[in-house]
Each structure stands twice: as structure tokens, then as C-alpha cells.
Amino acid sequence: MATRVASVFSSLTDVGIKAALQDEAYKRIKSNLREAEIINPYSVDARGAEALEELAIITNPHSIRLHTHAAAKSIENQMLNIVGHALPKEPVTFLFLKRGKLRYLSRGRIKDIFQNQEIEPRDVARYEHKTIVQKSLLLNTRVAYISDTLHFLRPRYIIDLFSQNVFLDVLYATVVLPVEASFKHPSQNPAIYTINYNYGGFQYLPGNHGGGAYSHEFEDLDWLKYGKFIYRWVDYRTDPISGKRVGTPKELVVTCQLVESLGANHLFIFKRGDLKTPRVRTFAKDKSVTFPDLFYPEEENANFPVDAELATKLFLYVKTLKTVTSQDVHGKLRQLLRSDELTRFSPMQLTHMVNYFMVVAHLDSCNDYSMLLGSSVWTQLTAPIQSKLRKLTEFFKGKSSFGKFCAALKWKTATYSLEVVDYVETRRDSFEPHPLDSLPDADDRDVNYDTDVSEDEADEKPAPKAPTSTPVPDTTPPASPAAPADAEYTQCWAAWDTVIRKHGFKGNQAQFDDDGNLITPIAEIKSLPKDSPRCAPELIKSLQEIARTPTLVEIDSKRSNAFGSDVKNGRIGMILKKQPNDWRLSFAAKCEHTSRKVHACVIHGAGGSGKSQRLQDWMRSLKKNSRECTVILPTAELRTDWVNKVPKQSLDTFKTWEKGLVQPPNRVVILDDYGKLPAGYPEALCANYPNIELLILTGDSRQSVHNEHNKQAATASLESNIEFWTQYCRFYVNATHRNVKRLANALGVYGERDEPLKVTCSSHVYDGWPVLAPGLLKAGNLAECGRRAFTYAGCQGLTAPRVQILLDNDTPLCSQRVMYTALSRAVNEIHFVNTGPSGDDFWTKLDCTPFLKTFLELSREIEIPEAKCQETAPAEATVKTHFPVENPNLVLEPYVEKMAEKFDRELYSKEYGYSNAIQTEDPVIQLFPHQQAKDDTLMWATIDQRLAITTKSENETEFALKKDIGDLLFINYHRAMKLPKNPIPFDKDLWQSCKNEVQKTYLSKDVGSIVNGVARQDPDFPINEIKLFLKSQWVKKVEKLGMVVKPGQTIASFAQAPVMLYGTMARYMRRMREVYQPSNIFINCEKTPADLDEWAKANWNFEGLAHSNDFTAFDQSQDGAMLQFEVIKAKFHNIPSDIINSYVELKTNAKVFLGVLKIMRLSGEGPTFDANTECSIAYHHTKYWVEPDVAQVYAGDDSAQDRTPVPRPSFNKIKDRLGLVSKPLTHRQVPGDFATFCGWIITPKGVIKDPLKLYASLQLAIRRGKSHEVALSYAHDAGLAYRLGDDLHSVLTFDEAHAHQCTVRDLVKLNKVEVLRPIWALD
């Protein structure tokens, strides 16, 4: 039907007017087609063109340019065009974008920056080499754009990008993700792309072309739902006044919004800040419906989306026929579906659809409900009752035919709109600095090898790189006259003055090493014949200028034969072992029988002397992608350095040593740092490739060399490459541009950098500095912890402004070459990290008893005294109270009034009489029973209550019978703590570290305590013998104030050696547990109240009921089942079997003076706290089903969580076989009934100490005259509540507020106001 505008044009009959209108229209069409030629220059079929026009993309019907996926490519270009209009007219950083696509962005001559990274192999051909960056991206622009790559990355990438680049404010990003893949539906735009679902993921095929396909995991589709990226961390800084570390919660929020959506291509904008974004993200019009289920089971229904128009047509068709057959519906369905749409439905889906409409066709569509039209008043009044009765009847008998018909027509709209979700990440590791808080220096971000030369780019800004650490001048510095005092010494190398200046040194200083020996910049001079090849004349000329003319060298067949033998027999290399057998046989034969000479130039010099500068200058002068030279490097890191310094040459110019053997080299071969290559490598290379005319070897004869670990290899018996080829080196450049003069001279090297040298030593590893470790294991562990770690020997080629060198027991084993390599890495600052024991007090403790050294592994060091600055004590400030003053006498008065007389509360024994736990005449002190080790009545009551005597055989039987229970406990513990599927490999370094921690903790005791334990340190002290003591303590639990005295707690005194051994085992498993521990579980071990407070604020949910738990007789209830659990857990951590067996032996045969103890937990056995905590977790998750996101806290037998757990029915079958009995409590999470944990109350404002318990404990200390000993600790506990201010009114009851005010008042009187509220928090 023509519109009114079209009708007006059709009413014009004058030929001239029509011609003029057509001419005007043609001009506009021509202009539009010219613009469309940029976006869509391809020939697109009719269906594709129609689909593109729906997306407002024009197709030129006369275009003949073909493309495998033209329609999808046109959408990509259109997205770039949209981005180009959105970008500001200022420099922008383009990520993952080819320079050739700038024309779609209409960017003009704006100096944009291109940074690309190789995410997948095809990126090698996609991006220009000079735009490739190898390390973390540094963005210096306000706006950036990521092109069609974000869907291959993880959400953390957005957080990293914004956190590491403080200038970045806006990020545009295009992604290619079909939204229908979220529901595993076929493509909604089959003319543009198709989707395959295979192998647990989906494959996006643009234009049905497999060559352009991308494979995705379903989790990649989450990019379509993210609305905000939230990263939370705590910024720890040192208070300049108090010197304490103060944590400030911080948050980075990046808001994301969908800007445009064209098919599977979507444009998003990411803006720094917490902004609004639509709750629902719409990608396409809702045009499909799903049918209700008519049959059982569910899969036998047409429960897939069907086009609403098609469904309506089929519905009307089946209801227009008097008699409907299956053939009719199949035929109509085939008629309505185009041929290209047939593959959208499987035969089974078509069958289910036909069955659905067959049912609908046979159901009665005539309404059989009561008709109100023209009915009587009585009928109208009773109609609702009749309707309800009918519904009730149909509920039992089933619906009528019309009711079924209506139910069958309740179609649901199938939508591709998605609800927006937030991506939230919280940093847990307190030692990990946040990028926004401590951006590393530029020198720390990039590793430079030897020298670096800047290169100007003509039309673009280069990707930001770190400044070169060891620059070498491009021009020869002018000769400076030597000082009169130095002139006598500098005459020693006057003949080499020109060569020295060609290397960038003045050579006019007399420098001496620490032994007083003169350091000469040129050393190890040899006279060799000169014989230059005809190739590379410019390079030969450059080498002659620095006295490095090549010489003719005969290849040593013995060395090449040994190397060829190792290659043939697969003794060395990784790639070489995978080569075909014929290739390896041929390689070995050439090594054995080839005899030849080759022109060689051997360049030796100290690190940073500029050995490779001339070579790199020559390679930069070559044409782009020249085939003149091949550079072979020992490591991938060194290869990357050469690629960055000589970017004009193709990537295959630079090869690692194995690729250099497999792939033929060019006629000029450079072996950089050849001392790190396997012995015999240069000879074997020349023997196999006769096209090599010039061999250049650069290295340092003073640094570490390759060490062949396979002692069966033939090359293991050869002298190193350095030792053999040194005879062909004309001289050694004993000077450096890298190290400052003081450091260079200490290493016996000449240097002219007059900068101060800083050397420090501590036990702390700094963040951001490269770490050098003596061995591979330590370096590997440090690297896994996020450190930039190298071995002493493997750091060759590294240049950094400052490095830290780890010292341990392996350091003295390193050779002089290795130590020289490590010490020469830094420019001007070295930090030594000493992880071993030190200090005079340490050795005093070690010598105080004769047995400590028998089981402690230690090495002695001399500690350099450090000057300590004096801290000025801040002036005391007046504290403003925010609670009304209360009468302190009324807090404990109710307990005093109910308290019975002394002997009514004491325990009584016929043999020993009354116990003596109620002491003094002070009624407040009498509230707290005082349990003492010398109280025999209490001691025997405790033994009767806490200990059970049995035999070793009964314990072993108990242990064996509970293995199945132990398995169940560990399975649930494994799931709760998210441990890996496979057992954790044993880490010897971590074990040693834990061992050192246990030893350090023990030796931190005062000398008197260590001497008192001399008997337990005796090797003759029986391993399984235990001495029992009664723990002396004041019982301060609020629920026990003024109550009858209860049995106390025992302390078990074991032999010291097994205590430390099993303590090491527990600490080792704790460290491993912390690696995998989920963030919603908090274990109060080595944590502070501030840590608990921070965690509770971030994780605890106060909306429902909370749960807490304690146990009855927790220690003595840990029977054979818990021991089995401990053993299985230890085996999962690959603890050595002899340690596990000895632990089982100790637990099943623990002897006291009464006999063998039943299997139980004993305080003092080593792993008490860790074992108690882990047993509590295992028991809790075995008894209850706990959702994965529930916040949980554990410490020993105490635990709590923010939701009530669901009991497992299966637990009832095993609870009788477990000795543990829990005491669960439910909390309403309102004032007076919040969850409690270890004396802390978890409130919406944070955790606070139980005010009544804190007040009672403080009163006991005050009345005993011990307030000065506990005031500081109690002030810290009360401070968390005090600093909440008036917020306390919302979390405390009247009685709790009363106790809190009285506690604070007493602490103020004790001069602890600065602890209650730090100086920085005062008004």
C-alpha cells in the first residue's frame, strides 16, 4: 500500500518533472553508494542483503567483490564506523586493531597509539610487528578501544586495564557473541552467520565459512550480561604518627553499557565510575514463542522457540480444517518453511511440533463455561460459586476439553533480553599490593638485555616502553685528559684508547678492585690471524673499527660429533627429541663426517659492555625482512629482547637454540650469550649448514655457562663453549655501562657511572623487584607467588635498576661465575634477602641446652646493626564520650547476688578434700573460679572427666573400623575448602620454610622457658610418653560467672622433637589450605580482629537467621574417625609416609602415668589448633548441607555462619559412630541476639567484643592489681566498638551498652584512650 508521499509523487505526470526528480534521487543514491562502498564493498546474496538492510547497512547490488563472509564483515566495518564517530578528536589507544582499519574509523591524522598482543597464533599475521607489545599494557590516553577481542579474555582483564592505567577513563570494545548461543538456539541471522554446538562449547561461523570461525566456551557469553566491574581491596599505609599500619577499604568501579547491537556484533562502553546502566539488556525483538508441555516426560514436547508468525499460521490452519491428519500438518509446515529454514529444526523437533498442533486441532475450541448474557439474576449471583466448584472438580478429575484447549494455548514469549549482573572481585591476600596503590617504576616493568638503542617511528607513536636501563652512546665520546694521578696508570692501555672510546668509554680513570689491583678496561689480549668473508661488507667494516676482525676457525669434529650423538639418541632438548628419526640420524651423520672451516668472530665482554651494539646497529640498517642474518638465542626471554630492539626484521630471524638447528639459518649467524648454549652447539650448527659464511659469538667468560644435567649425555664431558672458543677471542672488554662505578669495581670491572651504590639486607622480599634465587625450586616457588624470579645462573641477560638476591643454605654452593652473574645484574641497588636465622640472642638460646642442635637445622650469620629512629609519642587528646555515664556497680551485681557460698561451689573429694578455686574475700573476684595446677582435687576431677584409658590394640581397632567415616569427613572437607581434584605434590621448600617457622617460634621463648623444657629435649625422652598437667587459668566465661566449679583442662607435655615435627606438618598443610581456601570461609588463624571485621563487613549477610556452634568435650571426642580424616588429609598433601605413620603411632599409643590414652586430641601435641579447626569444618559439612556462598567462620571448636544450615538426612546413619556432639544455636541477628564467635559479636556495623565479657575480665584484672598487664590488649578489643560511635546504639542492648560504657571509662582511667581511638580518628 503506497504512502501519501508516494501517492503525491505518482500523481506527477510531467516527464520533465519526473526526470528532474530521478536525477536528484540518483545524486543522493550515488553519494550513499560511495559511502556504502567503504562499509560494504562486497557482493552479498539477496538474503544477506535483506538482513543487512534491516540493520541499516546498504548493499551495492552491482558490486562483484567477493568475500567468504561478506555480510559479517560488513557489520564489523559498520561497528568500526560507529566507534569512529564516538571517539573524541584526541589521541586514542587502539588495542588488538590492525592499522589498515583506520579508514573505517575516519580518524584522519590524529596521532593514535597502537598496542597489540598475540592472543592466538593467527595474530602473528594479523598485526604489524612494530605494534606488538609483550608485557602488560601501559595506556597514556584517556580513551581506548578494543576491537573484537574482549570475548577471548576474562572479566579480570577490565579490572586490570583500569587499575593499572590511572589515565584511562573510557574504553570502547566490540565483541562478537551471538546471544542466542546462551540458550543453545540456532542462529537468528542465518544469512549472516551460523552456530555449531560441539565438544562442550559453540563455534561461531561468519557466512557459514569455517576458515573464519571462532570457538568459544559458554562462559564467554557472560560478557553480554556484565553491567559493572567492581574490585575491592584494602590500602594499607603506615600512620606517620603512631607507626601502625592502617587499612582503608577502597573500591574501583567500572560501569558497562551496551551502545549498539548488530546481529552477533555488539559495541560496549566501559566508563570509570559507579554510573547507572539499564537493568535489562535487549539485543533483539521478541518474535518467538514456546509452547506449553502437553506430554510427559518433558523432553517429549515442543519446548523450543518457534517464530510467532509461523505458530499463529499453523494454529489457524489446523482449526480451519474439519478433519486434521498428521500428513496435513506436515505438508503445511513444509509449505510455510523456506528451504533455507528447514535446517533450523531437527526432525524430532518437527515431529513434536506436528504432535502439538494435532492435539490442539482435536481439542474443542467452543467455550463451555456458564454464559452470563441474558441469564437470570440467580445465575449471575451463583456463577462465581459454580466457577470455584468447577475448578475444584477439575483439580481432581481434570480439565474439560475447552479447558485443555485454553491451557495448550498459553504460549510464552521467548526473549533474548538478559538481566545485567555485576562482576565483583575482592582481593584477599594482604601481601599483594594493588596496582593503583603501588605502580612499579618503568624500569621494573621491562627487562633490558645489555644495551638498547631507540628508534624513531615516522607516522605513529610507539607503544609505551620502559626507558633503557643500560644505554650505550651511539657516538664515540671525546677523549678527556686523564687526571695527573691517573695518567701513569692509564698508559697501560693507551694503545687501545681508540677501541675503548669506540665502545663508549673514556678510559681516562685509574680504578682498583677491593684488593687494590688495577682494573684494565681491555684484558685477555690475543693475536690472531685476520681473514674476512665476502658477505656483509658493512658488518665486517664495523667489526674492524672495534678490532674484531673475523678469523678462520676449523670446526672441532669431536665436539660436533658428541653433540650429534646426543641429538640422535634424544638426550638433550625438547623439540629435538620430537624430530623424525631420519632427521636425527642425518643430523648426527653430518656432525660426525663433516670437516670444514668457518669465519668466526668471538666477542667477549662484561655485562653491559656493548657486545651486541654493533651487531644490532647493522641489523637495523638492513632492509625490512632481510634474509641476511639469523640470530640464535639460548632463552625465549633473550629472543624477545632482540625482537624488541630490532623490530624491522621478521620474527623468524630470531630463533631459540633448538629452532636454530631444525630450521636452516642464513649465511651470517649470531650466537648471542653462547656460553648458555649446550657444549658443541656452534660446531654442530656449522657442520650441518655449510651455507654459514660468518659465525659471530658473543658472551662473557666470567659469567655462568650451560650445565648439562643429563650426565649420560656425550656433551656433559666436553668443556664449555666459553672455555673452548676463548682462544679465538682477540680481547675481553672489561668495562660496563650497566653497573655504577662502585659496584663494577667491586666485581673487578671498569665503570664510569658516578652514581651512588645502595646495598641493603633484611628478611623481607620487596614487591616489584626482580628476585634472584640460588636454585630452580626456590625461583619457581617465588614465580608462582607472583614474583619476577630468576636463578643466579639463569638471570644472565637481565638488566634492572635494582635487584634483590635471596640468600639461603644453597648460596655457598654456587660457583664464582654464578655469583658474579647474579651480582652484576643491578645498576645501582642490591637488596640481600636473608631467610636464615640470625642474631646473638638466637645463638644464645641455641646454646642454652645441649639437645636443641640435634633436631634444628640452622646456619649462623652476622647481622649488621641497624639504626632505629626514635618515635615521638603523640600528645594525649581528650576523648568525647557518646554514651551516658552509668553506675559500674550495677553491671555484675546480678551475678554477685545469685552466687552461692564458697564450699557450695567447690568440688569435693574424699581423698583430697575440697578444691580451692574460689579465692579472696572480694565478691567480684569470687565470681571467677581460679583453677590451679597444684589443686589435687581439681586435677583428679579433670582426669576423670577429660581422659579415658584403654590399650593400644583397642585404639588400633578403633582406628581401623572408622576408615569409612574418615573418608566421608574428608570428602566433605575437600568440597568445602575447594581443594584440587588430584593430590597436592609435596613441596620440599615449603616444608623447610614451615620447619623454620616452627623453630623460630619455639626459639622466640625466653631462655628460662627453654631451660625448663630441657628434659623434653633429651633424645632419650620416650616419643610416646606424655606428662600431664592441670592448666592454671581464671574461668572468665560469662555463663560460668558465680557457678559451681567445673573440671579444668589438661596440658599434655610431649617430647619436643615430635611436637615440632607435627607442628611443621600442620603448618605445611595450613599453608597449602590457604592457597585454595574460598573467600567466603574465614579461619581465625594468624588473623587480627581487624581482619575479621573487614571480612565480616564484606561477606556476612544479616537478612535472615544466623547459626553458631560449639561442641561438648571437643578434644576427648575426636576419636578414630577424626584420626582417619587427618591421615587421609595428610596423604592428600603427600606428607611423607614415615611422618604419617609415626603420627598414627603416637595417637594410638600415647602413654600417661595411668596407661594408654584413648584416641583423642591433646593440647600440646603440635597440630592442635589446625587439626581442631579442620575437624570442625569436616564435621560441620558432613552434618549439614552448606550453600557455596554462605559466609562461615571457624577457629578450633568455635564456628558460625550467616545462614542456618540444612541438616543432611544421611548424617543420622553415622552420627552414632562419631564421638563429637555439636551444640548449635540460631540467632535472629538483632541486638542481643547476633551470632557470636570467639567472644566477638558479628553485627552489621562490624565485629565487636562481647561488652559484658570484656567488662568482667577487666574488672577481674583491676581487682587483682593486674590491670597494667591487660589494659593494652583490652583497649584494642574495645576499640573496634568504641570507634563505631553512635552506631553502637543500633547493635547493643541496654545492658550491653551499660557494660560497654563502664569498660571504656575504666580504660580511659588507665590511659589507653590513644588505643581506643587512634590520633587520626579524633575530631
Curated annotation (Swiss-Prot):
Which InterPro entries does this UniProt record tie to the protein?
(+)RNA_virus_helicase_core_dom, Alphavirus-like_MT_dom, DNA/RNA_pol_sf, P-loop_NTPase, RNA-dep_RNA_pol_alsuvir, RNA-dir_pol_PSvirus
GO BP of this protein:
DNA-templated transcription; mRNA modification; RNA processing; viral RNA genome replication
Which EC numbers does the record give? Answer: 2.7.7.48, 3.6.4.13
Q: Which reaction does it catalyse?
A: RNA(n) + a ribonucleoside 5'-triphosphate = RNA(n+1) + diphosphate; ATP + H2O = ADP + phosphate + H(+)
Q: Supply the SUPFAM superfamilies for this chain.
A: DNA/RNA polymerases, P-loop containing nucleoside triphosphate hydrolases
Is ATP-binding one of the keywords UniProt gives this record? yes
Q: Where are the transmembrane segments?
A: none
Listed name of the protein: RNA replication protein
